[in-house]
């Protein structure tokens, strides 16, 4: 076995002896192997690759590698000394008996088996075992033949075996010399490995092909063939990056046992450090040592592929990194070098090409003007000024006494106002109309003591020629007064403030800061067969009532959108209103010419029974209504069918009713009949079952009325104005001017100090009743007529419904401080209704406690926005 090793050593050592040193342009030496003669073996010969990479690639052990050449030489010398000491030990122990020699041979055999097992393990892959092709096996045999580090290792083993034999002393000396030569060559190769690291700039940032390879990486290059990474089991480049610390300096982990963290947050322990002997043995044993680099991010050794080595060689040779790129492609002559005898365009020169350039003339003119003004200095003037600046400077002794004052006056100089130019009256031969008559002359003379009241400070005169004009006797006086004006009258500058258009726009807060407000459609209440004109909600917010053109009133459950009850009315329902008093359950419905007071029979049964008991018997009234009231309205009894449907009181009117609205306490409610002229508004009292006309005259076509939430006031909106009446004093408090042609509806703030008026002209007017009778702000948010507006009882929100299918929610904050104006910010446009016959959304109402909004439209639906 020793003889076989000696033969292998003698066969592989010439591969090292064949290396020659070639001096490069930068003065350094590189080792270069002799190229094999055979062309076929040259294609599989990798010793040139090994030598080139040995010249520059580091072996990956940053802890043992040194930057300076001197340190590297010392470490190699120490390794040589250690091996010499080992040889001496072997020579001293040559007297061992045969049994110890047999044990040594068995240990060597075990070590060789372990090495072969390591080689097998290093070449193995986690893929399923498959039969290798003949080409791959032949290629592996070719790769194993020129392995230089293995030869060095076998030389060392041969030396150890021969040291046991006492008769091989001469051969040991020759082996020592060969080992020293090999160590010196390896030392120079290590020095050149650092140069490639510096040239490549190996850093944590990965480059293409150079990075951390998974354990399956070897299987992809098995047999020297580059297999598909997905076939090899590598399906993600990001999963290979096990260290998740990022692109940071890795020297931060020098003091720790770990080098980073993996994807699961576990520490990545640094690999065990190896000493110089282990590194040298690895260099001798590992066939891939020359192409192994160390990953600074994980501390592991990475074997470079053939593609990476080819890329490094091309970069070191100064070539293009792309193999497919050719520097010597055939030149394509896009533009011919031959001179064409006939031009492509033979247009005659334009006339302006023969004329001097006007722009150059202007430029020369500007330069001449700058020379005249002294802005541009000639070379002689520039040199003269430079000489003066370098020379001594002289100053006046008393210059500081008046310098600041003079500079201030020059800096703040204000031009004196010019005198007015003379007019026609000051001419020596003015037209006749400019001459004074006797009356004007007497008036001018009468202001002798008050000359500032005269229109002219002189009397116009007429002369036939300029020679007849006498000396102006007031010339000296006028010059004197002019000097007094310049001397005594102060002059000042007026600073003009430039205000941009962006400063005129008020700065509004972001809608995100004004939440909560309705943003999304939550529920749709379907059941009506015609457009829904009005909607109202119970004071507790559990039930909803709607009135439609299908002559029905429906009661819904808010949380489930389920229709609980349907009440037929016999006519079109134009308005519904739930009584705001939570102690009774009652709904007022305006259907045609009747007002129906309906008990919905939902909610608390005790409350329903209490309402029926309250409305069971009509109170006896001692007062007798006049004929004007009895002909307009009658409180009548209901039928049996109406009683079963929940109708408790019926009030007949003589005209069609457009609106019904409740007072805040729930005892009074008002109805509006626009076609009834001076009897358009009626106020009904539920407890006494009597009605009255608040107005004896009508000053316009009344559209809607509204009770004040706190005070005994009534808001009456005609087509163009809004009047506020005091019901106790029975007088007009104020008249509001919305500056519109037709008012559609209005809503009052819960505090009662602000009023919102909607018009059919796409505008909303916000009135501050304490501020003015004119609108505080006009909102033009909709594209069509606005049907209704509403305020929220608790949140600073208001909404508007329009025929453009949209419901706009806005923020309206009213402050307790009377000096601070209300804050109005549009928030969200909700367009979910469908347009039917040019009608969109009809009515809106807020939930009493939640920031929710209900809207009814012409598409027969009610929608809930939350």
UniProtKB/Swiss-Prot annotation:
Region of interest called Disordered, as start-end residue ranges on this chain: 1-180, 214-241
Matches recorded under SMART domains: BOP1NT, WD40
The keyword Repeat belongs to this UniProt entry's keyword annotation: yes
Keyword field: Nucleus, Repeat, Ribosome biogenesis, rRNA processing, WD repeat
Gene Ontology annotations for the cellular component aspect, listed alphabetically: nucleoplasm; PeBoW complex; preribosome, large subunit precursor
Gene3D superfamilies: YVTN repeat-like/Quinoprotein amine dehydrogenase
Biased composition (Acidic residues): 37-52, 60-146, 167-179
Keyword rRNA processing among record annotations: yes
Localization: Nucleus, Nucleolus; Nucleus, Nucleoplasm
SUPFAM superfamilies: WD40 repeat-like (SSF50978)
Gene Ontology MF annotations: ribonucleoprotein complex binding
Pfam families: BOP1NT, WD40
Position of the signal peptide: none
Any one GO BP annotation for this protein: maturation of LSU-rRNA from tricistronic rRNA transcript (SSU-rRNA, 5.8S rRNA, LSU-rRNA)
UniProt repeat feature WD, residue ranges: 527-566, 568-608, 697-735, 738-777, 781-820, 836-866
PANTHER family: RIBOSOME BIOGENESIS PROTEIN BOP1 (PTHR17605:SF0), RIBOSOME BIOGENESIS PROTEIN BOP1 BLOCK OF PROLIFERATION 1 PROTEIN (PTHR17605)
Family from the record: Belongs to the WD repeat BOP1/ERB1 family.
Function: Required for maturation of ribosomal RNAs and formation of the large ribosomal subunit.
Protein name per the record: Ribosome biogenesis protein BOP1 homolog
């Amino acid at each position: 076995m020793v003889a076989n090793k000696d033969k292998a050593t003698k066969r592989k050592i010439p591969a090292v002896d064949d290396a020659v040193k070639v001096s490069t342009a930068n003065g350094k030496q590189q080792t270069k192997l002799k190229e094999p003669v055979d062309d076929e073996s040259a294609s599989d010969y990798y010793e040139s690759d090994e030598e080139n990479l040995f010249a520059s690639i580091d072996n990956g052990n940053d802890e043992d590698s040194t930057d300076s050449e001197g340190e590297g030489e010392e470490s190699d010398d120490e390794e040589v000394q250690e091996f010499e000491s080992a040889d001496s030990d072997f020579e001293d122990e040559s007297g061992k008996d045969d049994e110890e020699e047999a044990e040594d041979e068995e240990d060597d055999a075990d070590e060789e088996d372990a090495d072969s097992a390591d080689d097998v393990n290093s070449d193995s892959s986690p893929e399923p075992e498959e039969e290798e092709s003949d080409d791959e096996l032949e290629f592996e045999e070719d790769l194993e033949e020129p392995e230089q580090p293995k030869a060095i290792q076998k030389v060392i083993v041969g030396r150890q075996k021969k040291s046991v034999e006492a008769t091989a002393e001469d051969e040991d000396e020759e082996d020592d010399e060969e080992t020293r030569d090999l160590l010196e060559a390896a030392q120079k190769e290590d020095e050149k490995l650092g140069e490639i690291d510096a040239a490549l700039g190996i850093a944590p940032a990965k480059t293409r092909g150079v990075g951390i390879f998974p354990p399956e990486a070897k299987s992809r290059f098995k047999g020297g063939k580059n297999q598909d990474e997905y076939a090899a089991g590598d399906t993600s480049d990001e999963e290979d990056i096990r260290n998740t610390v990022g692109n940071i300096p890795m020297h931060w982990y020098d003091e720790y046992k770990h080098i980073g963290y993996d994807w699961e947050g576990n520490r990545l322990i640094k690999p065990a450090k190896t000493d110089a002997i282990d590194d040298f043995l690895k260099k001798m044993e590992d066939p891939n040592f020359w192409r192994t680099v160390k990953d600074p991010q994980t501390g592991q050794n990475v074997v470079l592929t053939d593609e990476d080595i080819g890329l490094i060689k091309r970069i070191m040779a100064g070539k293009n990194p792309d193999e497919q790129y050719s520097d010597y492609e055939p030149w394509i002559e896009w533009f011919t070098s031959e001179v064409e005898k006939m031009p492509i365009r033979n247009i005659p020169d334009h006339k302006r090409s023969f004329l001097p350039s006007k722009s150059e003339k202007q430029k020369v003119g500007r330069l001449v003007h700058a020379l005249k003004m002294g802005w541009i200095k000639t070379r002689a003037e520039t040199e003269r000024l430079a000489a003066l600046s370098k020379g001594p400077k002289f100053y006046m002794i008393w210059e500081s006494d008046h310098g600041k004052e003079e500079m201030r006056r020059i800096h703040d100089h204000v031009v004196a106002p010019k005198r007015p130019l003379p007019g026609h009256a000051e001419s020596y031969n003015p037209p006749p109309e400019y001459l004074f008559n006797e009356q004007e002359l007497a008036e001018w003379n009468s202001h002798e003591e008050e000359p500032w009241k005269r229109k002219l400070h002189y009397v116009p005169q007429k002369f036939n020629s300029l020679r007849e004009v006498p000396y102006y006797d007031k010339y000296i006086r006028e010059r004197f007064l002019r000097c007094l004006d310049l001397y005594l009258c102060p002059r000042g500058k007026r600073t003009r403030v430039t205000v941009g258009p962006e400063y005129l726009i008020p700065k509004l807060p972001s809608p995100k800061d004004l939440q909560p407000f309705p943003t999304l459609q939550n529920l749709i209440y379907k059941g009506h067969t015609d457009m829904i004109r009005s909607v109202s909600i119970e004071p507790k917010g559990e039930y909803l009532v709607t009135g439609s053109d299908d002559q029905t009133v429906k009661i819904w459950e808010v949380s489930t959108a389920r229709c609980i009850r349907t009440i037929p009315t016999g006519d079109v329902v134009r308005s519904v209103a739930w009584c705001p008093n939570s102690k009774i359950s009652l709904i007022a419905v305006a259907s045609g010419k009747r007002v129906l007071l309906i008990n919905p029979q939902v909610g608390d049964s005790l409350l329903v029974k209490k309402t029926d008991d309250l409305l069971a018997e009509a109170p006896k009234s001692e007062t007798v209504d006049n004929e004007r009231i009895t002909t307009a309205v009658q409180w009548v009894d209901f039928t049996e069918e109406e009683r079963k449907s929940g109708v408790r009181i019926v009030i007949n009117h003589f005209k069609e009713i457009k609106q019904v609205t409740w007072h805040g306490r729930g005892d009074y409610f008002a109805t509006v009949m626009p076609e009834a002229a001076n009897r358009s508004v009626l106020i009904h009292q539920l407890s006494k079952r009597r009605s009255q006309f608040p107005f004896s005259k009508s000053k316009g076509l009344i559209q809607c009325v509204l009770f004040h939430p706190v005070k005994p006031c009534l808001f009456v909106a005609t087509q163009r104005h809004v009047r506020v009446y005091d019901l106790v004093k029975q007088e007009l408090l104020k008249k509001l001017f919305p500056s519109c042609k037709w008012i559609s509806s209005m809503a009052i703030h819960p505090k009662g100090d602000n009023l919102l008026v909607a018009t059919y002209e796409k505008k909303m007017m916000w009135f501050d009743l304490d501020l003015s009778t004119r609108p505080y702000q006009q909102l033009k948010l909709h594209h069509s007529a606005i049907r209704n507006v509403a305020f929220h009882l608790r949140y600073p929100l208001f909404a508007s419904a329009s025929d453009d299918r949209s419901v706009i929610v806005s923020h309206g904050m009213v402050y307790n401080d009377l000096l601070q104006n209300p804050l109005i910010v549009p928030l969200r446009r909700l367009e979910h209704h469908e347009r039917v016959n040019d009608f969109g959304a009809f009515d809106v109402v807020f939930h009493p406690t939640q920031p929710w909004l209900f809207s009814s439209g012409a598409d027969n639906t009610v929608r809930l926005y939350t």
